């Protein structure tokens, strides 16, 4: 990998991490289309630290408030005494499924699941599920139903959305896509589902990124160029990711997710066509 590839991959990660179109899929697809080597699951996990930083900066007030309230609740032996402390526990509960399943299927995530056939299928399948979730949202809006707000998220919702997040272990599913879809099924507005999705991403993305970084650290120390490339890609992904968060939250205030649904289906079909014609290899 050279510096130009690192910058391009950083831009792709930043653009696609928060949009429901799967960053891991795009980091697998674009190198294949451009004739580059697959950057691998470790590279994908590490540069997500950049987009993690974007979430920390964008939501720093919410994060400080939630963290402070959660710690205060523990110290005062009243862990659910405030809405912010409850949110801290809901985020923790929602993180459990992806941690457990990530450890159980670690080998598959790094190998089998990176097949372009699996990625194309995931892109299309999640698009169809998200389309149905949008249909349910339209029906609720037509009936004038009250939507689920963040302060009403309880254990059930946190675990269900956490299970949805664990589907993102399969490239092509999209972490934001699965969690936003889960939120829509539970009756959240699009913007509320996206906000909870971003907050829920913090523990899992941090853990995966640090784990992979420690795992490859000796190799990075032995290769200065690789360390520079990884650092550049991570920084670029953070800068672009911040803008991507702002865009999506504003976009979902006024629009549905149909734009992303159409894109996912078209990309999935394109991939299948390229694979069937022998223009791309599955691995």
From Swiss-Prot:
It comes from Chloroherpeton thalassium (strain ATCC 35110 / GB-78). The keyword Glycoprotein does not apply. The chain crosses the membrane at residues 1-21, 40-60, 85-105, 117-137, 196-216, 232-252, 258-278. Catalyzes the dephosphorylation of undecaprenyl diphosphate (UPP). Confers resistance to bacitracin. One of its GO terms (molecular function) is undecaprenyl-diphosphatase activity. It is found in: Cell inner membrane. It catalyses: di-trans,octa-cis-undecaprenyl diphosphate + H2O = di-trans,octa-cis-undecaprenyl phosphate + phosphate + H(+). Its main location: membrane. Belongs to the UppP family. Keywords: Antibiotic resistance, Cell inner membrane, Cell membrane, Cell shape, Cell wall biogenesis/degradation, Hydrolase, Membrane, Peptidoglycan synthesis, Transmembrane, Transmembrane helix. One of its GO terms (biological process) is peptidoglycan biosynthetic process. The keyword Transmembrane helix applies. PANTHER family: UNDECAPRENYL-DIPHOSPHATASE. Bacitracin is thought to be involved in the inhibition of peptidoglycan synthesis by sequestering undecaprenyl diphosphate, thereby reducing the pool of lipid carrier available. Pfam families: BacA (PF02673). HAMAP family: Undec_diphosphatase. Its EC number is 3.6.1.27. This is Undecaprenyl-diphosphatase. InterPro entries: UppP. It comes from the Bacteria. GO terms for cellular component: plasma membrane. It is a multi-pass membrane protein.
């Amino acid at each position: 990998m050279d510096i130009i590839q690192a910058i391009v991959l950083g831009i792709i990660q930043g653009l696609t991490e928060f949009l429901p179109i799967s960053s891991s899929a795009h980091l697998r697809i674009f190198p294949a289309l451009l004739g580059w080597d697959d950057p691998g699951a470790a590279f994908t996990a590490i540069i997500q630290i950049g987009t993690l930083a974007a979430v920390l900066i964008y939501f720093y007030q919410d994060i400080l408030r939630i963290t402070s309230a959660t710690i205060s609740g523990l110290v005062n032996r009243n862990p659910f005494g405030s809405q912010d402390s409850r949110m801290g526990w809901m985020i923790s509960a929602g993180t459990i499924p992806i941690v457990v399943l990530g450890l159980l299927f670690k080998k598959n995530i790094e190998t089998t699941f990176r097949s372009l056939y699996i990625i194309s299928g995931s892109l299309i399948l999640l698009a169809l599920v998200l389309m149905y979730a949008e249909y349910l949202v339209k029906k609720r809006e037509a009936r004038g139903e009250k939507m689920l707000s963040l302060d009403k998220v309880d254990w059930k919702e946190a675990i269900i959305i956490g299970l949805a997040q664990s589907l993102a272990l399969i490239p092509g599913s999209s972490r934001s896509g699965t969690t936003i879809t889960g939120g829509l099924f539970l009756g959240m507005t699009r913007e509320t589902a996206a906000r909870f999705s971003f907050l829920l991403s913090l523990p899992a993305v941090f853990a995966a990124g640090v784990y992979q970084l420690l795992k490859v650290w000796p190799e990075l120390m032995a290769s200065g160029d690789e360390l520079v490339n990884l650092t550049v890609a991570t920084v670029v992904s953070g800068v672009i990711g911040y803008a991507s968060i702002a865009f999506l939250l504003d976009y979902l205030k006024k629009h549905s997710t149909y734009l992303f649904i159409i894109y996912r289906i078209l990309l999935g079909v394109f991939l299948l066509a390229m694979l069937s014609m022998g223009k791309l290899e599955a691995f």
